[in-house]
Amino acid sequence: MSVSLSFAASATFGFRGGLGGFSRPAAAIKQWRCLPRIQCHSAEQSQSPLRRSGNYQPSIWTHDRIQSLTLSHTADEDDHGERIKLLKCQTNKLMEEKKGEVGEQLQLIDHLQQLGVAYHFKDEIKDTLRGFYASFEDISLQFKDNLHASALLFRLLRENGFSVSEDIFKKFKDDQKGQFEDRLQSQAEGLLSLYEASYLEKDGEELLHEAREFTTKHLKNLLEEEGSLKPGLIREQVAYALELPLNRRFQRLHTKWFIGAWQRDPTMDPALLLLAKLDFNALQNMYKRELNEVSRWWTDLGLPQKLPFFRDRLTENYLWAVVFAFEPDSWAFREMDTKTNCFITMIDDVYDVYGTLDELELFTDIMERWDVNAIDKLPEYMKICFLAVFNTVNDAGYEVMRDKGVNIIPYLKRAWAELCKMYMREARWYHTGYTPTLDEYLDGAWISISGALILSTAYCMGKDLTKEDLDKFSTYPSIVQPSCMLLRLHDDFGTSTEELARGDVQKAVQCCMHERKVPEAVAREHIKQVMEAKWRVLNGNRVAASSFEEYFQNVAINLPRAAQFFYGKGDGYANADGETQKQVMSLLIEPVQ
């Protein structure tokens, strides 16, 4: 069989040669032009293999719909920018005025974080918390009778990479009873702060584990007992926190909720509230522009039209990137991650649904070797898949080399090769009807969920990346595995029923049921315990030695938060209408008033 390709001139895939796969400028290289129109001519007709279908819904976010999104207050953007600058200056003055008042400083920092504007004051907050960390024992004594302040101090330090001991809460335990003091049971604010702090538990921290059980029980009692909690902000916060703790929430959506709740609090700061509103809407406009840009790229690429078997979810893929890193200076990562997410979905559907086993073996081999010269062995649709990934990775590698003088391509190649190898292993399991043990499944499932590729992309596209940072990435940092495992298990919880119906490999719950001969409810409870253990490991890795490490750790922590957002109530990724559409509207389209 002979195959010829007719390459359209509109969308260009650059063939990049050179040492280590490093990209050279497009003018100096040969070009592969293969999209959006591809014509395949066969010299002989052979019977097409039987293809499965995922029966996915088409995207509700068409290119025209995305391009029609309007920016809020566009005529006043310059004025809003000046107002934000003025309000930032006022907030800096406020931080100066509160020096020496530790409790008030802690409350202000907490408000800045929850209002989503702490990134404007990163250095000032870090310096303040560094001082608190140096005086931790003295401040702890100062707050010996104040549960709220003690828990807030503990949480803010841990959230920002300072390793502090759970022993700060021993003073709130009754030595004779061996449990938390009875007087705390009615302190709603203190209980709520301790509840949120308890979700930063590390391995072996029994006191925080006790604190979670204690606060959960008594916060529920306060909500249920008539007259215990009057209507107001604290009641809203308690109900909201019991649904999902702060440490596991999608930050931008939480910010929008908190702005709405805090503005009804009579003690709120009007200037700080205005800063949060203006900043939220300014970032929302930025996100709309970014989404417009990646939508043009996606439309020019033409993959959904040429390969209609996979899930076309550009807007959702961009939203993943916003969850990972929302700040303005992370656009390079958001752009590359959106593209990577699109390709992950495409290739995942090739392995899970569309490809034959023989085709998948060939594709895996070529991805491992990163060998563009071998693509003639592939069927036409796989050539398109390979070239899309190959050229996008190499183009990103060229830009990073040009701007920073470091070669990220080997690290992205490694991540793509590992992903495809794990996809291949699971495809063999499916085609042979094999059900692995839970440990055997999980051993590779944290790779096959694509988290390591996403985090490799985050690492390589970080704005402060240096050669020294890249050298450290020869092996994955310890935070990567628990982050990816949580992504995997959230995904399995939300999608396994639908994926099994399409013909996918057995997931964590089914592997546990098969191995232990237990019903689904028991298996799910066991997987929940595995997830809690991984959260403890993840929390234990929140110690950053540099701004770059802090950025990367934040992305790693946001990975399971994104999974909770998309899969907490089913498959909010594949089934992109309903709740997911509401959240997209809230974050990307509807400004705060």
Curated annotation (Swiss-Prot):
Recorded GO CC terms: chloroplast
Compartments where found: Plastid, Chloroplast
Cofactor: Mg(2+); Mn(2+)
Keyword presence, Cell membrane: no
Pfam families per the UniProt record, alphabetical: Terpene_synth, Terpene_synth_C
SUPFAM superfamilies: Terpenoid cyclases/Protein prenyltransferases (SSF48239), Terpenoid synthases (SSF48576)
Chain sites annotated for binding Mg(2+) 2: 348, 352
Binding site for Mg(2+) 3: 491, 499
Location of the transit peptide in the chain: 1-39
Reaction catalysed by this enzyme: (2E)-geranyl diphosphate = sabinene + diphosphate; (2E)-geranyl diphosphate = terpinolene + diphosphate; (2E)-geranyl diphosphate = alpha-pinene + diphosphate; (2E)-geranyl diphosphate = beta-pinene + diphosphate
Cofactor: how and how many bound: Binds 3 Mg(2+) or Mn(2+) ions per subunit.
GO molecular function: gamma-terpinene synthase activity; magnesium ion binding; myrcene synthase activity; pinene synthase activity; sabinene synthase activity; terpene synthase activity
InterPro entries to which the protein is assigned, alphabetical: Isoprenoid_synthase_dom_sf (IPR008949), Terpene_cyclase-like_1_C (IPR034741), Terpene_cyclase_plant_C1 (IPR044814), Terpene_synth_N (IPR001906), Terpene_synth_N_sf (IPR036965), Terpene_synthase-like (IPR050148), Terpene_synthase_metal-bd (IPR005630), Terpenoid_cyclase/PrenylTrfase (IPR008930)
Binding-site residues, Mg(2+) 1: 348, 352
Pathway: Secondary metabolite biosynthesis; terpenoid biosynthesis
TM stretches of this protein: none
Domain notes: The Asp-Asp-Xaa-Xaa-Asp/Glu (DDXXD/E) motif is important for the catalytic activity, presumably through binding to Mg(2+).
Family stated for the protein in its record: Belongs to the terpene synthase family. Tpsa subfamily.
Record protein name field: Monoterpene synthase 7, chloroplastic
Lineage: Eukaryota, Viridiplantae, Streptophyta, Embryophyta, Tracheophyta
Recorded name of the encoding gene: TPS7
